[in-house]
Curated annotation (Swiss-Prot):
Function: Might be related to the phospholipid scramblase and tubby-like superfamily of membrane tethered transcription factors.
PANTHER family: PROTEIN LURP-ONE-RELATED 4, PTHR31087
Family: Belongs to the LOR family.
Protein name in UniProt: Protein LURP-one-related 4
Organism, scientific name: Arabidopsis thaliana (Mouse-ear cress)
InterPro entries tied to this protein: LOR, LOR_sf, Tubby-like_C
Annotated S-S bridges: none
SUPFAM superfamilies: Tubby C-terminal domain-like (SSF54518)
Secretion signal span: none
Amino acid sequence: MARVFPQAAISSPYMSTERETFTVWMKSLVYQTNGLTVYNSNGEITYRVENYDKCSNEVHIMDLHGNILFTIRKKKLWLFGSWYVYRECGSFTSTEEVKPCARIKRSSIRDGDWEVRDETNEVFWILRFDPKFAFQIIDIHGNIIAQVKPKQSSNGITLGEDVLTLEVKPRVDHSLVVTLVTVYGLIKGIDGEVKQLRDFEEEEVAVGDEIAIEI
């Protein structure tokens, strides 16, 4: 059974024997649609997502020509849920028709981080950092598989929250890494909703206390 992140040299357009750097623009090329566009170091579009939305239960990762490489499906579990990743299964209507190649869920042992478990039961981690969209993907030994951080100009100026730099180590399937970046974007959307809910609850308590004092 294939690993999510194979380490052997493989002839694939989605892997390289060298470290690769991509620019991720958290926007769609299609007018007025949510999405994500990924450029390689030559400025060429390599991946795109046109139905990216924090409310989406299904998201497709495509190549430049619109061929579906991965499908992300969300399984709702209270506020957070978990995400299942399927290879080239955009035509499937039921998750029971094919097994996922990876599952992503909130870690039960690493607070604030997310667990990635592949079809061979190998575990990876998505480790978040202080900036809104900065994180690393590491293996069980702590080796960095890929990392994402805000993109900066040659003068060190951050280009914006929706423009990112993605670095992928050699012999890693960068199409799947882009898929995990997409999942993390969905996760950050959910986290934002949770924060808003907590802020609202705190405001409700504060208002209630104030009224009680006035009475």
